[in-house]
Every structure is written in structure tokens, then in C-alpha cells.
């Protein structure tokens, strides 16, 4: 019984991070160059960066699911606070 209780405590401790919303940088194609402060996202969202192929802009934000890249774009999703800084 003690072993089960200890195992549950360890699992709960490891999952604590997933209970809190992430802080993600959020900016669009017009404001990407001054995206300097992370904002709180909804619980369960992940951070993302959407890059165009020639490096002229980057869209940053948070979403329930990772966005789909369009032609000449690429997407990077991440799962810890402020992970979409660069």
C-alpha cells in the first residue's frame, strides 16, 4: 500500500507542470520583429513558431493543435513555457 501511495505521489509530482497554462510569445506577421514578452495561453495549448521559407517573418503564438504549414512555410511546436522565443 505504501508503495502504491509513493508511486502515485511521484506521478502527481511529475505531472504538475501540465496543470498550468504555458506562457508563449505571441505576434503576427506585422509585429514579429518586436515580439519580446510572453503571454499566458489557455490551459492545454502549446506554443508554436510559423516561419516563412525566406526568413522575412515569423508568426508566434499558442494553439490547441499545432498549425499546418502552408506552401513555403514551416512550423515548430513546443510544450514548455517560453519555448517559442527563437
From Swiss-Prot:
Any GO MF annotation of the entry: toxin activity
Query: GO CC terms on record?
Result: extracellular region
Alphabetized, the UniProt keywords read: Disulfide bond, Neurotoxin, Secreted, Signal, Toxin
- The record lists the membrane-crossing segments as none
Q: Found in which tissues?
A: Expressed by the venom gland.
Q: By its UniProt entry, which SUPFAM superfamilies does this protein fall under?
A: Snake toxin-like (SSF57302)
User: Quaternary structure?
Assistant: Monomer.
Q: What is this protein called?
A: Sulmotoxin 2
The organism is: Spilotes sulphureus (Amazon puffing snake)
Q: What is the lineage of its organism?
A: Eukaryota, Metazoa, Chordata, Craniata, Vertebrata
